[in-house]
Swiss-Prot record:
Pfam families in the cross-refs: UPF0102
Superkingdom of source: Bacteria
Species per Swiss-Prot/TrEMBL record: Kineococcus radiotolerans (strain ATCC BAA-149 / DSM 14245 / SRS30216)
Name of the featured protein: UPF0102 protein Krad_1407
InterPro entries according to UniProt: Restrct_endonuc-II-like, tRNA_endonuc-like_dom_sf, UPF0102_YraN-like
UniProt xrefs under NCBIfam families: PRK12497.1-3, PRK12497.3-3
Family: Belongs to the UPF0102 family.
Entry GO MF terms: nucleic acid binding
Length: 122
């Protein structure tokens, strides 16, 4: 029997919601949960000629801060390094532009999740 912690289940749900939002916006998802020794990229997508590396943050409430507030400058620096590693691991992908996005998902006790997509965070 596989046991999934509640926090992990919420995170997985948030990633599914984020992927649905990105595809509804016309993006093509190229990779999910890509891992290397340095870390993990939640979602890699293509938006026209732009490669989009997306951090997904999911919260059950905002009492400890919003999901967007959890994306620190250090987290963005790590995401930039991981983007370089992803591109090195995928030599056939040569996008003219690369963008870092954040999708923040809040999953309340009741009601639908709220989703905020911030394109081009720096």
């Amino acid at each position: 029997m596989v046991h999934v912690r509640a926090k992990d289940a919420v995170g997985q749900y948030g990633e599914r919601v984020a992927v649905r939002r990105l595809t509804e916006a016309g993006m093509t998802v190229l990779d999910r949960n890509w891992r290397c020794r340095s870390g993990e990229i939640d979602v890699v997508a293509r938006d026209g000629d732009c490669l989009v590396v997306c951090e997904v943050k999911t919260r059950r409430s905002v009492s400890a801060g919003t999901a967007l507030e959890a994306v620190t400058p250090q987290k963005l620096a790590r995401l930039r390094r991981l983007t370089g590693e992803w591109l090195a691991a995928h030599p056939g992908v040569n996008p003219p532009r690369v963008r870092l996005d954040v999708v923040a998902v809040t999953v309340p006790e009741r009601g639908p999740a709220t989703v905020q997509h911030v394109a081009g965070v720096s």
